[in-house]
Amino acid sequence: MTIIIDGKKIANDLCERLSQKIDILKREYNIFPCLKVILIGSNPASQVYVRNKQKKAESIGISSETIVLPNNILEDELIEKINELNEDPSVHGILVQLPLPNHISASRVINTVSVEKDVDGFHDENVGKLVKGEKNCLIPCTPKGSLHLIKSIEENLSGKNAVVIGRSNIVGKPMFYLLLQENCTVTILHSQSKDLAEYCSKADIVVAAVGKPNFVQADWIKKGAIVIDVGINSVNVGKLVGDVDFEGIKGKAKAMTPVPGGVGPMTIAFLMMNTVIAACLQKGVDASDFIS
């Protein structure tokens, strides 16, 4: 019987424990974690994501503010705003909601955010630290949350064969390095890969992040595998499905995540955790309790 991994419950449990640690930071260290989110324009999906992040932050004791800027803002004006937040010692985390308008360079914006305040973990320096396996860095939230879900089923991943489908900088590539650090043998597949089914059929762990509904078929998955579905796709007038054939794989996999209610809540939980880690690092407080 397949275990359906309840990402919402696991995320809520994490945030409850994090809230207790935030209370300690406030009481004993006079640290009041603060997250600033920059939203460009009025993309409905982005508005929902940002609202969910702010709601969760406030519920666990993180001060949060969303700064809404017009869609036609100049790139240099946005950079100036980010630099203001970089220089504000009361701000510990800065998140610029993606995607950005076409006239703005995402790379320049991401790398303008201070390395220590980069709670998305997208800054080139944080990416480099992840690749090197350093622990005291900010790691992208979705891969970090996905790994936590995998380890909720199986703690020791050493020697496991893992397949990551998708090579984005946000999910696929950092997921590859996180699994590598767990001593997995990792294969990353993408749009130009051949024989995807063959690779997946040998995998103990499959992480799907391609943005294509029901892309991963049941006959690709070996019995007893752990399947993490990062995708969230809208089909049939608002119905949400993931990147894997949930009904087909259920009963075959050892464990799998649903969509919604799997990886999504974990992404927000680890954004909260990254904000607290960032506050600790900036204030010289040992953040080891939050980095595991």
UniProtKB/Swiss-Prot annotation:
It comes from Wolbachia pipientis wMel. PROSITE patterns: THF_DHG_CYH_1, THF_DHG_CYH_2. NCBIfam families: PRK10792.1 (NF008058), PRK14187.1 (NF010784), PRK14188.1 (NF010785). GO terms for molecular function: methenyltetrahydrofolate cyclohydrolase activity; methylenetetrahydrofolate dehydrogenase (NADP+) activity. PANTHER family: C-1-TETRAHYDROFOLATE SYNTHASE, CYTOPLASMIC (PTHR48099:SF5), C-1-TETRAHYDROFOLATE SYNTHASE, CYTOPLASMIC-RELATED (PTHR48099). Keywords: Amino-acid biosynthesis, Histidine biosynthesis, Hydrolase, Methionine biosynthesis, Multifunctional enzyme, NADP, One-carbon metabolism, Oxidoreductase, Purine biosynthesis. Belongs to the tetrahydrofolate dehydrogenase/cyclohydrolase family. The keyword Oxidoreductase applies. NADP(+) binds at G166, R167, S168, S191, I232. This is Bifunctional protein FolD. Homodimer. It catalyses: (6R)-5,10-methylene-5,6,7,8-tetrahydrofolate + NADP(+) = (6R)-5,10-methenyltetrahydrofolate + NADPH; (6R)-5,10-methenyltetrahydrofolate + H2O = (6R)-10-formyltetrahydrofolate + H(+).
